[in-house]
Amino acid sequence: MINIRPDEISSIIREQIEKYDQDVKVDNIGTVLQVGDGIARVYGLDQVMSGELLEFEDKTIGIALNLENDNVGVVLMGTGRQILEGSTVKATGRIAQIPVGDEFLGRVVSPLGVAIDGKGEIVTSDSRLLEAMAPGIISRKSVCEPLQTGITSIDAMIPIGRGQRELIIGDRQTGKTSIAVDTIINQQTEDVICVYVGVGQKASTIAQVVNVLEEKNAMSYTIVVASSANDPATLQYIAPYAGAALAEYFMYKGKATLIVYDDLTKQAVAYRQMSLLLRRPPGREAYPGDVFYLHSRLLERAAKLSDKLGGGSMTALPIIETQASDVSAYIPTNVISITDGQIFLSNDLFNSGIRPAINVGISVSRVGSAAQTKAMKKVAGKLKLELAQFAELEAFSQFASDLDEATQKQLARGTRLREVLKQPQNSPLSVAQQVALIYTGINGYLDDLPVSNVKSYCASLMTYLTTSKKPYTEIVRTTNQFTEEAESSLKEAILESKEAFSKTN
């Protein structure tokens, strides 16, 4: 008979108990009740958070938006064609995030951070929440540095500062995207990281923007986030937040960033579609009640950070499309009230050949003037008033037959100033060039030239300033001030180039 030793058995059992490691994994799992139109109703997800990512059986990802008594309303980030009624859904425990990093520069990505430009996968270790909190009051600093757009009429009359939110608003086909793209191109020498977000655009339009940026060597400091018109509404809704997260990554590293949302009208339409399908009560123009918050929480993320946080900035240029120039519609008035000013583009001006077609009368920048360079402030101080008076006089002069000499002079100068401010697409100007053009126009040096010759003379003046080695350009470029020396140098250049121009024309 075997001699059993109880103490040995008990020590073996004790050892086994100590070694026993039960790895319990608890998954929050639900069942699909109904699916269709990019929306799924899920039963059984009791522990789910608002905004949490959910994974379906076919690996489609969804976001939990509606938390109701007996089910959860989920918006799908895909077609959802493989999702069946009764299939299981797993809560991931994660809120929507996007990978971020320097590796994204020069790339075209989807709102989920996946490369769609055929240049290979983007590998990065950092990520940021799509819906990050905007910087608080203490974290901010007032706007104090200029963001040069390279467009004379904007930099002179509607100046934009780093950390500002300036709305670009106008009807379709009035040059809204062109202004934004020109601003990105102009950042080549400014050390500004740019993010272009295309929301609900045609794929061909986004490709065109990318081609222009590549031609102008601007893609090296630009990220394009693209959600085209055939993407699900969910992707169009999150695209601006994805762009903001990418820009924030650079902003918190102390860099200056510029983000363009093209355009927020389409994001609002996508959000309306999702909300109506989720059976949320509709409000004005069938938009849900929180459509203001949709845009305010996005645009509040643009800021000029305090020196303690690195002094980075994020300048936002949201674009809104109006119908028949109606700026009093719901979405335009919402975004106008959130932003720090607006650039209004007029259909009539565009069709009459004035491009960029900026309506100076109702365009305004509420904080940018504090950031305007001293050189520009000194020269362009009277420009906006002069053009506003000219527009008024021009309207009255259509009814009056005989005008006094002073009025005729003012009309003649206004016409020439308007010519000076016309600018071809994708050809931004430096501050020194802009100051020279405005100085020439506002001080009457163009009054004796025929209107048809103004553009060609301005081009010859720019060439003369570049080739004649006048100290003017260097003074303005290095000091950002229009000193007496710079002024006398510019006067000489104007008179000399005018003399040469009159001989050839």
Curated annotation (Swiss-Prot):
It is a peripheral membrane protein. Pfam families: ATP-synt_ab (PF00006), ATP-synt_ab_C (PF00306), ATP-synt_ab_N (PF02874). InterPro entries: ATP_synth_asu-like_sf (IPR023366), ATP_synth_asu_C (IPR000793), ATP_synth_asu_C_sf (IPR038376), ATP_synth_F1_a_nt-bd_dom (IPR033732), ATP_synth_F1_asu (IPR005294), ATPase_a/bsu_AS (IPR020003), ATPase_F1/V1/A1_a/bsu_N (IPR004100), ATPase_F1/V1/A1_a/bsu_N_sf (IPR036121). It is found in: Plastid, Chloroplast thylakoid membrane. ATP binds at G170, D171, R172, Q173, T174, G175, K176, T177. CDD domains: ATP-synt_F1_alpha_C, ATP-synt_F1_alpha_N, F1-ATPase_alpha_CD. It catalyses: ATP + H2O + 4 H(+)(in) = ADP + phosphate + 5 H(+)(out). Keywords: ATP synthesis, ATP-binding, CF(1), Chloroplast, Hydrogen ion transport, Ion transport, Membrane, Nucleotide-binding, Plastid, Thylakoid, Translocase, Transport. GO terms for molecular function: ADP binding; ATP binding; proton-transporting ATP synthase activity, rotational mechanism. The record marks S363 as: Required for activity. Its main location: plastid. GO terms for cellular component: chloroplast thylakoid membrane; proton-transporting ATP synthase complex. Its EC number is 7.1.2.2. F-type ATPases have 2 components, CF(1) - the catalytic core - and CF(0) - the membrane proton channel. CF(1) has five subunits: alpha(3), beta(3), gamma(1), delta(1), epsilon(1). CF(0) has four main subunits: a, b, b' and c. NCBIfam families: atpA (TIGR00962), PRK13343.1 (NF009884). Belongs to the ATPase alpha/beta chains family. HAMAP family: ATP_synth_alpha_bact. Produces ATP from ADP in the presence of a proton gradient across the membrane. The alpha chain is a regulatory subunit. This is ATP synthase subunit alpha, chloroplastic. It comes from Phaeodactylum tricornutum (strain CCAP 1055/1).
